[in-house]
C-alpha cells in the first residue's frame, strides 16, 4: 500500500518508474491485475479533468468505481473525513482518491487508515498527479528535464500546481521562473525566481499558465486588463523560442491568462496534458496497490 499526497515523498527513481509505467500504459500494455477491485473518488471541490481522468483510469484498469461528492456524504451530517474513509475501507474499497479544500487534509489520515490515499488536490497545497502528467508531457517533448527553463505564470500564491511543479522540476535539474502580480507571489515557494512576464516568455522552453484562483481569494478579482499585463498574448507568444511549448493545468479561462487563439495553437500541449493524465493516474493507482505492468528496457533516464 502506497499513498501519494505530495511530490516530495517520491524519489527521483520512483518518478522515473511512474513515468515509464504511464508511457507503457499509453502504448497499450496492461494486464488487468486490478480487475474487480474498488476505487472511491471523493471530491469536496468541483472538478472536471481530475475527477473524470481518475474514473477513466480506474475503469481502464478494470476496477469498480464509486464516485462521491462532498454534498452526498455523511460529512454533511458532521462525520469526520477519517470515519468516512474507514467506512469505505470497511465495505471493501481498495483505494481512495480525495480532493479537499483544506490544505494537508491527509496529514494525520494516512497513518490512521489501511487503504492508500491518493491526493487529487488539497486547497493551495499540492496536486501530485497533475505534476506527474506535466512531467510526462515535458519529457515526451524534450527527453530530459536537466537544463530546461520552465516558467509558471499567474496566481502563484494560491496554486497547488505551481507548488508541486516548482519543487520537482528544480529537483530534476530544470530552472523555474515565476511571473505574475506582486500580491500573488508566494514567499514560501523558494524553488523559482520572479521575473517579468516578457523576460520569462522569451527565455523559457515551457510556458505554463495558471488561472486566477477566484475561489481562494477573499474578494472578487478584476480580470480587466489581466491578459495584457500578466497573460500570454499573441504578441508575447511570437517571442517564444521556436521549440518552446505552452502548457496549462486547466480549467482555462480563455482571454484572461491566455489568448483564446493560443489554447489550441501549434505550440499548445494543453489537451495532450489531459490525455497523459489518464495514464499517469493508472500508473499511480498501480503503484498504490503495488502492481505494475511488466517493463522492457528502461526508457526514462532522469539526470539530477
From Swiss-Prot:
The keyword Phosphoprotein belongs to this UniProt entry's keyword annotation = yes
Q: Indicate which residues the UniProt annotation says bind carbamoyl phosphate.
A: 49-50, 99, 127, 130, 250-251
Quaternary structure, from the entry: Heterododecamer (2C3:3R2) of six catalytic PyrB chains organized as two trimers (C3), and six regulatory PyrI chains organized as three dimers (R2).
Q: Which organism is it from?
A: Bacillus subtilis (strain 168)
Q: What does this protein do?
A: Catalyzes the condensation of carbamoyl phosphate and aspartate to form carbamoyl aspartate and inorganic phosphate, the committed step in the de novo pyrimidine nucleotide biosynthesis pathway.
Q: Where does L-aspartate bind?
A: 77, 160, 211
Q: What EC number(s) does the entry state?
A: 2.1.3.2
Q: Which Gene3D superfamilies match?
A: Aspartate/ornithine carbamoyltransferase (3.40.50.1370)
What does the record give as its pathway?
Pyrimidine metabolism; UMP biosynthesis via de novo pathway; (S)-dihydroorotate from bicarbonate: step 2/3
Q: Which GO terms describe its molecular function?
A: amino acid binding; aspartate carbamoyltransferase activity
Q: Check the record and name the Pfam families matching this protein.
A: OTCace, OTCace_N
Q: What class of enzyme is it?
A: transferase
Which keywords label this protein? Phosphoprotein, Pyrimidine biosynthesis, Transferase
Q: Name one GO biological process term.
A: 'de novo' pyrimidine nucleobase biosynthetic process
Respond yes or no to whether keyword Transferase is given for this record: yes
Q: Which reaction does it catalyse?
A: carbamoyl phosphate + L-aspartate = N-carbamoyl-L-aspartate + phosphate + H(+)
Q: Which family does it belong to?
A: Belongs to the aspartate/ornithine carbamoyltransferase superfamily. ATCase family.
Q: What is the protein name stated in its UniProt record?
A: Aspartate carbamoyltransferase catalytic subunit
Modified sites of kind Phosphoserine: 303
